[in-house]
């Protein structure tokens, strides 16, 4: 299975740089996994696609203003992208600079140069940085940090992104990228779903910058996934098991919810799913046997990305690539601020050969 099997041609003009003016007003491409049939609509159509007793699983992570600009005390500009908060004063971060800071180097951060920091140690590609400030990490980031827009949104972050690049139900700070399928849900839609009898549960997966890293091997089985922290608490496990027992569907809102639930299923010893509080490197690609998910709400993903592979494993490779080609023809908007898909599971996807006509 080659990375190039997941390539498709995407005009630059279809990459969304701003979200739809109304969260739930984006377009929705629906893909029926069993048949490959496609239908076009708007996001609020999910209300008609869900039944009373179905379970929606959301990721309640909150995007932190993780990008900081500054300089080394010795001179030279730096850009810090926080990957993970270690405690109240230390972070793991990506650092861009003409010359990487050495251990013990002093950093002066913020456009107003209000924060002193020290590079403590290097861990492979990440730098451990300590903020030499009595304030905690989150307070500092909220003061001097910028929203970490994805690399394909080619513009500076704006004040509005602090609201628009967050789900309305975010709770747990720690992500450096939004769980973007959730961006389309506004309070009126959530209320309408509750009134219909749709159940809701919340996992946490702190999305890392690794989500944007390209697959750097030709044979995808050789790819090593980046690590992200996920939590699937007991109440989510109970909700999933109750949903299955009554014959309803579990619908994941976004690939991060998929990866959280499937990680919890993989780690369960003698049960379908068990509580999970750990890092996950789960890599889902065609041939994977899904355990939990019956339907998926997700945005359109990058060509050759691990996320289009995840979707292909769920809906079937041919169905997925056909849907993406139709989406391009129909000028759907792509990536984080773009349009969405509603996909039902293709039970035959696991046996499908990838790349074969």
Swiss-Prot record:
Q: Which Gene3D superfamilies match?
A: QueA-like
Q: Which residues cross the membrane?
A: none
| GO MF term set | S-adenosylmethionine:tRNA ribosyltransferase-isomerase activity
The record's EC number reads 2.4.99.17
Major localization class = cytoplasm
Q: Which cysteines are joined by disulfide bonds?
A: none
The alphabetized UniProt keywords are:
Cytoplasm, Queuosine biosynthesis, S-adenosyl-L-methionine, Transferase
**In the UniProt record, which is one GO cellular component term?**
cytoplasm
Domain of life from the UniProt record: Bacteria
**What reaction gets catalysed by this protein?**
7-aminomethyl-7-carbaguanosine(34) in tRNA + S-adenosyl-L-methionine = epoxyqueuosine(34) in tRNA + adenine + L-methionine + 2 H(+)
Q: What biological-process GO terms show up in the record? A: queuosine biosynthetic process; tRNA wobble guanine modification
From the Swiss-Prot or TrEMBL record, state where the protein is found.
Cytoplasm
Give the pathway listed in the UniProt entry for this protein.
tRNA modification; tRNA-queuosine biosynthesis
Partners and quaternary state?
A: Monomer.
Chain's role = Transfers and isomerizes the ribose moiety from AdoMet to the 7-aminomethyl group of 7-deazaguanine (preQ1-tRNA) to give epoxyqueuosine (oQ-tRNA).
Family recorded in the similarity comment: Belongs to the QueA family.
Q: What is this protein called?
A: S-adenosylmethionine:tRNA ribosyltransferase-isomerase
């Amino acid at each position: 299975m080659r990375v190039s099997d997941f390539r498709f041609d995407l005009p630059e003009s279809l990459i969304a740089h701003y979200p739809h003016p109304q969260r739930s007003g984006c377009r929705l491409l629906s893909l029926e996994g069993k048949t490959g049939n496609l239908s076009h609509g708007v996001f609020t159509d999910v209300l008609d696609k869900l039944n009373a007793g179905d379970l929606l699983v959301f990721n309640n992570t909150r995007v932190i203003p993780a990008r900081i600009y500054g300089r080394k005390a010795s001179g030279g500009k730096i850009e810090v992208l926080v990957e993970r908060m270690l405690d109240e004063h230390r972070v793991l971060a990506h650092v861009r600079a003409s010359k990487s800071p050495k251990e013990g180097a002093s950093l002066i951060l913020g456009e107003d140069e209000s924060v002193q920091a020290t590079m403590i140690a290097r861990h492979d590609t990440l730098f451990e940085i300590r903020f030499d400030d009595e304030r905690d990490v989150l307070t500092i980031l909220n003061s001097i940090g910028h929203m970490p827009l994805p690399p394909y949104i080619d513009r500076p972050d704006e004040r509005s992104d602090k609201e628009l690049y967050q789900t309305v139900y975010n709770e747990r700070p720690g992500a450096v990228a939004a769980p973007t399928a959730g961006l389309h849900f506004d309070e009126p839609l959530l209320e309408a779903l509750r009134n219909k009898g749709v159940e809701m549960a919340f996992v946490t997966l702190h999305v890392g910058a690794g989500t944007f890293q390209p697959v750097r091997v030709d044979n995808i089985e050789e790819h090593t996934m980046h690590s992200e922290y996920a939590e699937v608490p007991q109440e989510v496990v109970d909700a999933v098991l109750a949903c299955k027992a009554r014959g309803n569907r579990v619908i994941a809102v976004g690939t991060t919810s998929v990866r959280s639930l499937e990680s919890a299923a993989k780690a369960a010893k003698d049960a379908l799913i068990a509580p999970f509080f750990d890092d996950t490197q789960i890599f889902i690609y065609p041939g994977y046997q899904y355990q939990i998910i019956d339907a998926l709400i997700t945005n359109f993903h990058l060509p050759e990305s691990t996320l289009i592979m995840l979707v292909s494993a769920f809906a079937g490779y041919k169905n997925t690539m056909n849907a993406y080609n139709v989406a391009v023809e129909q000028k759907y908007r792509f990536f984080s601020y773009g349009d969405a898909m509603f996909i039902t599971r293709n039970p035959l996807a696991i046996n499908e050969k990838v790349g074969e006509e």
